[in-house]
Amino acid sequence: MRDSKDRFIIRKNRVRAKIAKLSGGCYPRLSVFKSNRHIYAQVIENIGSNKSNTIAAASTLDKDIFTESKYYKCNIQYAKKVGQLLAERANSKGITSVVFDRGGYKYHGVIKALADGAREKLNF
């Protein structure tokens, strides 16, 4: 039986393969990282097979979100705010469509809230 870390890596590789197959590299991807305390998201444009360029980024450590609370911010409320902030920053750079890269995380809870917040101004 595989442990949770192995299952996470398998899910992550499966999601990345689907993104590469479906988008064909023509859309930037919205990548998500979650820790126990914070959540981070960035819009990445893949230039080649080994090169990538970050277009916009947002996290719970940003000044707009950080001033509201001093405690843990990896919850649904803050994840939605991070998604909205990232969508605003991507729109200011001219990005309207992205592919959602949830990594190895299940599409549930915080990850879903971030996607819903970003979906208000971006097309998936």
Swiss-Prot record:
One GO cellular component term: cytosolic large ribosomal subunit
UniProt name for this protein: Large ribosomal subunit protein uL18
Organism (species): Orientia tsutsugamushi (strain Boryong)
Subunit field text: Part of the 50S ribosomal subunit; part of the 5S rRNA/L5/L18/L25 subcomplex. Contacts the 5S and 23S rRNAs.
Purpose of the protein: This is one of the proteins that bind and probably mediate the attachment of the 5S RNA into the large ribosomal subunit, where it forms part of the central protuberance.
UniProt GO BP: translation
Keyword Magnesium tagged: no
Molecular function terms from GO: 5S rRNA binding; structural constituent of ribosome
The keyword 4Fe-4S is assigned to this record: no
Family classification: Belongs to the universal ribosomal protein uL18 family.
PANTHER family, alphabetized: 39S RIBOSOMAL PROTEIN L18, MITOCHONDRIAL (PTHR12899), LARGE RIBOSOMAL SUBUNIT PROTEIN UL18M (PTHR12899:SF3)
Keywords attached to this entry: Ribonucleoprotein, Ribosomal protein, RNA-binding, rRNA-binding
